[in-house]
Every structure is written in C-alpha cells, then in structure tokens.
C-alpha cells in the first residue's frame, strides 16, 4: 500500500515508527496512499489546502501567492541572550514602538554569575525597552521563555515567532517558528517573514503510551527515525490521529518542543477538549477553536507512531538523534559506550573521552540527573518524577538530581500540592525557572562526568565543559520518568517501565497572579519619552560595507564533520554573557572547534593583499579592479547550522570579516537565513573533493549580477606560482528581499 520503511530505534526490537515516503491523503483519521486517495476522487492540489498548516499560513500570508509566502506574526518572544541585539538592530532601522506583542524573558543569563554586572545590565535594558516600545518583560526566574508563551500567549490558529530554535507551540494550536534575531527585526520594522510554501508531513499517532513512558521517549524515537536522512527537514509536522486524545496537554507539549531536533520548520497539532481546557485554565477561553484536517487533506509524506510500542529511550552523546532504547543500552552497554567514545575521538579529537569506566559489574552508572526547562520542567513531568521517587531517595553518593520547574506558577502548584515536598524528601535539589542546563550555564557536571537530562540537546560541550581547559563531559537525553527511576537506584541506569509505580498527577491550578504581580505588561502602551538604559557591555554593531562585484575570500577554517552545530560555531554557556557586545563575543567564534580561526580571520582583515595575489587577480578581472578588491574570510563546513537559532553563529563571523560560508548543504533554514541577514553569501559546493584548502584565496567575480539574477557564481582559486583554477558555486533560492539584503551588506543596511 505504501512505499514505507519500518524504523527500529537502533537495536530495539519493537516497531515504533513507520515512515511513508510518498504523498498521502487523510480520511476519517486514517492515511490513504496517494493512489488510493486519487481513486476515491481526492485531489492533491485541493488536498494541500485542507491541512491545518495551510489554513493557518494562508490566514497570515500577505503576498496573495500560495507558493511565495509573506508572513506577519501575531506575537514574538525573545530571551536575554538575543533581545538586546534584536532591539539594537531594530533601533538602527528606525524602530519607534513594537507593532505586535513582544515578550522579553530572562531565562538564560539569569544567574548573573559571569562578567560582573553585564547580565543584569542586559535585564535592565530589556525592562527599559519594554517600557519604551510597549512590550512584556518577564524577570529572571519567573519562567523559561516557552513555558510563558504556552501559558500566556498561545492560541488556536495563531502564529508566533521566537528568537530561540525551540519556539514550538503546535500542541496548543499555534504554529510557532524559531529563527535568528534578524527575522524578528523584520517583524518589528513591519516587514514580513518570506518563505516558499513548506511541504507538510502528517505525523499520525495511534495507541496510548505505557505507564513509565513519557514525552521525551516519543520525541527521541521520532528524532532517531527522521533526522539522519533529513526526512522532515524544513517541513511542517502536522500531528493527527486518535492517539492524540490519549495524551495530556503537557505530554503533547513535551513531544512538540523536541520537534526542533528533527530539523523540521514548524509543527501543528489537532486540537480538542484538552486544548480548550488548558487555554481556559490560563485565562484565554476565547483562544480556543477546533483544528483538524479536512477530509481529503493531502500531505507530502507521513510518519506513523504507535504510542503503545514506544519504549523508554536514551539519546547518547553527542546528538538527540543517537536514540536507543534503554533496554538496548542495558543489554549492550559496552558496545554502545565504545561507539560514543569513538565518535568523540573522531569528531572532537577527544582521545581521552571515556564512558566505559561508568560500567560496574556490567551495569551503567551515571553521575548526574537533570529535569529542566521547556522540555523537562513541566508540571506533569515533575509530578511523575515524584511518583517514582516517593518513599525512596537519590542516595548519598556522587550522583545528584536537580529539577527546574519551568515557571513560577508551576513551582507554586508543586509546592501547594506536596509534590515538591516529595521530591525534596528524596534528596532532589530544587532550582528555579532557568534554562541553564540546556545550554551550559547551570549544573555543569564534573570533568569526564556523564549526565542524564530531560532537556532539549546534548551537543558537545552543551553541558558547560571547556575543552580548551582540558575538560570534557557528556550528556544523554532521557525522559523525566526514567531519570527519576535512575535516581531511585542511586545513578544506575534504569527505565521507568522496569519499576512498579503508581503515577499520581494532582489536578493543576494555574495562579496567574504570580505574573500579574511581577511581570511588566506594556502591550499597546509604549512610553515614547522613556529612556533606554545601557550598561557598558551593550555596544552597537560595527559598520558593514555593501557587497562589491569582485570579492577576494581567504579560507580560514575547514570542517569536514558530517554536521557542524551552532554551538561549535559560537559556544553557549558563559560565552553567552557577551552577546550584547558583538566585538567581544566574536573573540569566541569557533573557539572549541577551531581555536586558530579568530587569529586567521583577523589577519585577513588587517594584512594587505600581497602583490602576487593582486597580480593573479588582475589576470582574471584586470589590473584596475584588482587594485580595489573587497576582501574577507570564508569557512567551509559540510553541513553547518544544526541546533540553536542564535544569529551570533553568523554575525560573529561577519564582525571578523566573514563574507561567506561554503557548504554541501545547510543543516537548517534558520542558519542559512542568519547568514543572509548578515550579508554573507550562503555558497553551495556539493562535491566531496575540494579544489581549495585552508589558507587558499578564492576570487569571486560578477557577484552583483549573480545575486540579482540568481545565477551561478564564478570563482577562481589563487595560489602563488599556479594558474588560477576556476570553481563554480551556487547560491540556492533567494527571495527578492534576501537579494536586497546581501547586496546591501546586511539587513540593517537594507533598512536604512
């Protein structure tokens, strides 16, 4: 019936996921093959307009063209390591007030423990911006960004844009997109989010999870099935099926937020009475409407998940897609740990990285457990963890377990109903609403420590270790239930399904007064005369020149890993404190992956072009043009940009004179957009064998017409004593606005 593939999560024996790599139609909650749907009179062209995704996108599209979308969002959100740059850039473009609700949360540099006053200076700036321009300011420790947006801003049929890659509220009927800061700048300057109409993937859920299986287990199984082959890359996931009704809202939210790790563009779910009740409980009953695909809705491909077959999962270092069942790891721990050690040696150069020393009598012991943030710190997850630990303890050894409720209302409810007391009595450490463990700014494990976390990512050094100081640690992702089960056994890896647990989820009461008393809400009430308050670390962007017709690039970094993450391009953790200072932050670019990059990039900027290079260039473009060459640096990476939406992964290169990236492909749409918005050429070179190497100079010619007309770019590799070697690059699809930005040199220039 289908051209499909049964997915076994690594070495597991249970059929969990089926991928259908062809078009399907939706009818009566089931999926029909394209052939069968056409035989029943359905049309793919009409069916595409019957999806939930299409209806929401169309309602927000200002272009009048179903294929070329220009989206205006209903609301936006940023946290304290992105909003300063966004507002500064918008000010340069003429910002007078926020034209849509804009929420500024302070959940990343919340501890104010690095750099003296600089983190709190950013927070003071954020409050002054909310006052001046009319926004919402959520102070530190009140809520992580996505918890607040779910609780206070989501609504059926709405669209929200966030400067964080995990901006996902699909389970609440809201299409949400995580992008780099410049895309938010465009909205603040009353421009649009321009994309080609995305393809849509039906994710059909059936069955019901077994006790002990949580949202992270479902999410990791999905990520493990679709990430490596790009099955859903840059597509919208539309969750349908009768299995949805068997999932509480917070369970759905927990799956939904992790869809970012599949490399999809956005997500949306069918809504029901549980959605209605959640929105009503949070003071927005009018935000509910029933969302479901119409009969005959057409999807470009599909994924089917049997929830009853999903097992307790673990994603091994160093990516969420390295998903195994915990049962597999328990059975084959030595082999699986050695695979992780091999990956560390090959990809990180970490020859001394060891996990097999965590084995005791054939059983795996971990050093730390964390349940935190938008994925882990939900009310239901922490109640489930308390159920597992009730009457037990985490032990008096090296193992520790910390929990981070995602918001103060959640924290308050857990305290009122005794759940937090149960956790504390078991030896659990209570933290605040803080994203630190997700990006390396909180609960950093010991050197060579192995931490299990219900958070969003386990990329290299994402837990906060500093390889440059000889440190290394690692994280495996798990669900809160199995983390609690492991804690109950004092660090011995344990699936929650191995234990007999009576799960109790007390009724949740949301107290919105917590926010009303502490959060500033200035939506629609800008105070134009109010002054912005700047700390000494908050600086303007440097001047960036417009693109010229000829460009001499020097290759200053060459990375051949299968995927390069944004964490490798610009580290998170302590480094994030400097994101309000472009020049200072740029000093950390590629510091963990290629420590020599910054010095090489600076040398390109500061040193004159050698006469021999000018002579070689003159042979191609003429002597006059060669005497006035624009110059800059370029990096090569096979597939850069997986992970965070942080614009600094691109802007830091730009500050150091970066003018382009060369790649076989770009891991995410958002990273490519960040390059474009900072005026950098997103060059494509698909060949495995490279005609250029580290230190080579590449002359690009005829750039202005190539960008304007979308044609191939002609380049020449210039080496002393050798004839210029011709090489061709592609740019890929560019919107008219993106072309304008690249030609102007960056988004700010194009807005002036």
Which stretches of residues belong to each language-model region?
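Fe-S-dependent hydro-lyases/dehydratases of central metabolism
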Residues: 2-752
């Amino acid at each position: 019936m289908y051209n499909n593939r049964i997915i076994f999560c690594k070495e597991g024996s249970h059929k969990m996921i089926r991928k259908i790599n062809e078009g399907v139609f939706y009818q009566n909650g089931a999926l029909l093959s394209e052939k069968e749907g056409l035989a029943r009179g359905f049309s793919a062209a009409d069916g595409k307009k019957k999806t939930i995704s299409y209806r929401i996108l169309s309602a927000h599209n200002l272009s009048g063209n179903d294929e070329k979308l220009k989206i205006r969002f209903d609301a936006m959100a940023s946290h304290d390591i992105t909003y300063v740059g966004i507002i500064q850039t918008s000010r340069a473009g003429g910002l007078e007030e926020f034209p849509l609700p804009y929420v500024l949360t302070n959940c990343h540099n919340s501890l104010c423990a690095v750099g003296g006053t600089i983190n709190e200076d950013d927070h003071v700036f954020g409050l002054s911006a909310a006052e001046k321009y009319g926004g919402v300011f959520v102070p530190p420790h009140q809520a992580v960004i996505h918890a607040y947006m779910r609780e206070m801003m989501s609504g059926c049929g709405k669209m929200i844009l966030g400067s964080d890659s995990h901006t996902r509220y699909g389970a609440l009927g809201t299409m949400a997109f995580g992008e780099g800061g410049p895309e938010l700048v465009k909205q603040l300057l009353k421009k649009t989010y321009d994309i080609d109409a995305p393809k849509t993937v039906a994710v059909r859920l059936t069955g019901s999870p077994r006790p002990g299986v949580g949202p992270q287990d479902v999410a990791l199984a999905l990520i493990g099935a679709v990430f490596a082959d790009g099955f859903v890359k840059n597509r919208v996931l539309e969750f349908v099926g009768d299995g949805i009704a068997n999932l509480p809202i917070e369970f759905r939210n927990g799956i939904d937020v992790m869809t970012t790790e599949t490399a999809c563009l956005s997500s949306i779910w069918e809504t029901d009475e549980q959605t209605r009740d959640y929105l009503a409980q949070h003071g927005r009953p009018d935000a509910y409407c029933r969302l479901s695909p119409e009969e005959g809705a057409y999807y470009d491909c599909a994924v089917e998940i049997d929830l009853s077959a999903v097992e307790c999962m673990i994603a091994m270092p160093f990516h969420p897609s390295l998903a195994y069942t915990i049962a597999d790891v328990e059975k084959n721990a030595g082999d699986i740990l050695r695979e992780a050690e091999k990956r560390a040696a090959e990809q990180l150069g970490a020859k001394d990285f060891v996990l097999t020393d965590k084995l005791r009598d054939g059983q795996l012991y971990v050093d730390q457990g964390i349940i935190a943030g938008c994925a882990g710190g939900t009310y239901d997850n922490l109640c489930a963890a308390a159920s597992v630990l009730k009457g037990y303890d985490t032990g008096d050894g090296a193992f520790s377990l910390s929990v981070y409720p995602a918001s103060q209302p959640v924290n308050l409810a857990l305290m009122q109903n005794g759940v937090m007391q149960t956790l504390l009595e078991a030896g659990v450490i209570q933290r605040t609403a803080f994203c630190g463990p997700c990006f390396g700014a909180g609960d950093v494990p010991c050197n060579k420590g192995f931490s299990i976390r219900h958070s969003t990512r386990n990329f290299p050094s994402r837990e906060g270790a500093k390889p440059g100081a000889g440190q290394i640690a690692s994280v495996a992702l798990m669900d809160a239930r199995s983390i609690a089960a492991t804690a109950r056994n004092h660090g011995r890896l344990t699936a929650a399904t191995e234990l007999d647990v009576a799960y109790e989820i007390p009724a949740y009461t949301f107290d919105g007064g917590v926010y009303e008393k502490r959060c500033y809400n200035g939506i629609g009430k800008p105070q134009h005369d109010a002054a912005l308050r700047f700390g000494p670390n908050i600086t303007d962007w440097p001047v960036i020149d417009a693109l010229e017709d000829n460009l001499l690039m020097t290759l200053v970094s060459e990375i051949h890993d299968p995927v390069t993450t944004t964490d490798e391009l610009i580290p998170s953790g302590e480094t994030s404190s400097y994101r309000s200072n472009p020049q200072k932050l740029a000093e950390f670019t590629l510091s963990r992956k290629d420590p020599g990059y910054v010095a090489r990039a600076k040398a390109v900027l500061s040193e004159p072009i050698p006469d021999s290079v000018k002579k070689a260039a003159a042979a191609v473009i003429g002597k006059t043009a060669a005497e006035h060459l624009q110059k800059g640096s370029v990096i090569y990476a096979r597939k850069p940009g997986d992970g965070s939406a942080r614009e600094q992964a691109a802007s830091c290169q730009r500050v150091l004179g970066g003018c382009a990236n060369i790649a076989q492909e770009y891991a995410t749409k958002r990273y490519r957009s960040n390059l474009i918005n900072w005026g950098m050429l997103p060059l494509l070179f698909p060949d495995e064998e490279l005609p250029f190497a580290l230190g080579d100079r590449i002359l690009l010619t005829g750039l202005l017409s190539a960008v304007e007309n979308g044609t191939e770019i002609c380049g020449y590799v210039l080496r002393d004593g050798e004839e210029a070697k011709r090489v061709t690059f592609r740019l890929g699809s560019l919107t008219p606005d993106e072309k304008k930005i690249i030609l102007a040199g960056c988004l700010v220039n194009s807005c002036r």
